[in-house]
């Protein structure tokens, strides 16, 4: 059995297959998944799992170079934004880029996979750009 926190087989497989610059999206329950992009559906019910818990577990296995958020998250100020800022301050997310929510949805078309959580706070979506460990 794995020793790291991430136990989901599909998610672990996708992270292990990422190359430098590849994108993994973690989204709330309402984020549309583009046709042809793999969906890893973790959602059980509203709020379970929450966005931040899923993100923290992904970060336990993924080297992140940068991340993209929809700028609307700054307007709505969901509680998850404080956690995102903390992770940014800890350098776990690399450089931040803000785009419109529509541009974020277009970016998700390039993702290797979209991880759907049960999160129901507005704009709790992040595109993680894979880095390298060397």
Swiss-Prot record:
Q: Tell me the domain of life.
A: Bacteria
User: Keywords in UniProt for this one?
Assistant: Carbohydrate metabolism, Cytoplasm, Isomerase
EC number(s) from the headed UniProt entry: 5.4.99.62
Pfam families from the UniProt entry = RbsD_FucU
Q: What would be one Gene Ontology cellular-component term for the protein?
A: cytosol
**Active-site residues?**
20 (proton donor)
Q: Which residues bind substrate?
A: 28, 101, 123-125
Main location group: cytoplasm
GO terms for biological process? D-ribose catabolic process
Pathway assignment reads: Carbohydrate metabolism; D-ribose degradation; D-ribose 5-phosphate from beta-D-ribopyranose: step 1/2
Q: Report which reactions are catalysed by this protein.
A: beta-D-ribopyranose = beta-D-ribofuranose
Q: Name one GO molecular function term.
A: intramolecular lyase activity
The coiled-coil segments of this chain are none
Q: Which residues cross the membrane?
A: none
User: Which locations, inside or outside the cell, does it occupy?
Assistant: Cytoplasm
Tell me how this protein assembles: Homodecamer.
Q: What does this protein do?
A: Catalyzes the interconversion of beta-pyran and beta-furan forms of D-ribose.
HAMAP family for this protein: D_rib_pyranase
Query: What family does the Swiss-Prot or TrEMBL record give for this protein?
Result: Belongs to the RbsD / FucU family. RbsD subfamily.
Q: What is this protein called?
A: D-ribose pyranase
* Species this protein is from: Pseudomonas fluorescens (strain SBW25)
Q: What is the lineage of its organism?
A: Bacteria, Pseudomonadati, Pseudomonadota, Gammaproteobacteria, Pseudomonadales
């Amino acid at each position: 059995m794995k020793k790291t926190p991430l136990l989901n087989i599909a998610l672990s497989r996708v992270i292990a297959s990422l190359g430098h610059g590849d994108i993994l999206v973690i989204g709330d329950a309402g984020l549309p998944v583009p046709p042809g992009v793999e969906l890893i559906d973790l959602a059980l019910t509203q709020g379970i799992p929450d966005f931040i818990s899923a993100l923290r577990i992904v970060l336990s296995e993924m080297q992140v170079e940068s991340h993209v958020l929809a700028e609307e998250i700054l307007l709505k100020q969901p509680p998850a934004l404080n956690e995102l800022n903390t992770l940014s301050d800890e350098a776990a997310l690399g450089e931040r880029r803000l785009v419109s929510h529509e541009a974020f949805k277009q970016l998700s078309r390039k993702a290797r996979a979209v991880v759907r959580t049960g999160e129901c706070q507005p704009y709790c979506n992040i595109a993680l750009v894979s880095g390298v460990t060397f």
